[in-house]
């Protein structure tokens, strides 16, 4: 009997009442229907059809099979996985924008507080040191200072750092200049040694030190330098990389913070760049590093008295180094390693942005890639090695542990490099080809816009470069993500160390001899970066699909990304040496 008004009951078919897959642009038939031939007419009717009428139906049925299966795979496998990736990226984006907002507000508060009461630490000007030409017993307020200059085949810049260090204003009997030369080129070693001898002839207390091997790289050189008897007599150590040129009053400005505040272990100063206007890539680097110093270092110093040591242009208290275990070479970020360990011992750090030290930015794409790999991979690897040590530490507060684990390491050193590439270069382009997945506008537009605005606020003079900065950083995100994963997983390349190439002058043509060996014709192929070009092809496919068949309208952004990856894939970024 029927249950709907006496109508005869019918046997319920297992076929669905509507197509299994429905999108905003096209409806697909159930993928199993062609196998069962459920759409075929009865045998008698099929026999009555003319041949011309039956052939198109067979062709349509066979041609719909691949499309049906592709739609099924997309809807049942790709879409759920992509949707999960979208929400994971949105969660990480929220973490990143919250961290950026917190750091931005803290840095603005630090800037306001500095105008009212300075840096919050006692600082008193030092008495004039004795004349270098007529040495006299130095006042007791001038402690022994060691100036370390580690270098490795620095033919282009070794004179800059040595000359600047020897010109520092400090009693000559209270300062020691230590040049740590790990050069493997005998000619360069001879040049550096002759330069040290020349300054020694001018009554400068300078020491030239070499090692039999490069074990530990920079960390090993610094550690070996501290083992010398004369170095153990020093109370403080200033460190400058080979391309850094401190002003003569550097010690007179930084040392009072250390002398009058015994809890301070490190005074970090800001980098200034002599070659930032060489090319677009160096201008973009300056934007990123200015944000790093103005926001990350300033907020860390103001809120937590902690930040990552930048490896150069800073002055350390020797007792803090010794108490923290000295220099370790377990990662490629020995500077950050020492800073974290010193912080866990209760030491405080101070960032003084008013003191600037001239330095050089890498101007070739290859050199910049190596530098970013070392920094990103080393930081992620240090997170892996020190996470449990931070958790179990009993000498610092829970608030500082939270800052170290979550803000300093997890968000900035792990989430940031992975999210930028995964979300903006993989997930968003792929979603343009999957209409079942929609990204909320707040995650697609509002969050990246907020991050860009916060960066622009602290770099008002570089607002016109923001579009180029976004595209460049997204391309570099691929290398940073690979480096971060390499560090987190501690792969074979986790401890690769490549010294950043330096040129020593903004204009090479003004020099009598070339600073770099001309590239051989076969080496020109090294300018082609296959990963960038492959990703450019992927982005081009996604953008073209969205333009022709899609409805997300992401193609403008994706096309721009494809252009950026193509340009950098062929090496058309930074300075270039012509092929011979």
Swiss-Prot record:
It is a multi-pass membrane protein. PANTHER family: GLUCOMANNAN 4-BETA-MANNOSYLTRANSFERASE 2-RELATED, GLUCOMANNAN 4-BETA-MANNOSYLTRANSFERASE 9. Its main location: Golgi. The active site is at residues 182, 335. Pfam families: Glyco_trans_2_3. GO terms for molecular function: glucomannan 4-beta-mannosyltransferase activity; mannan synthase activity. This is Probable glucomannan 4-beta-mannosyltransferase 2. Its EC number is 2.4.1.32.
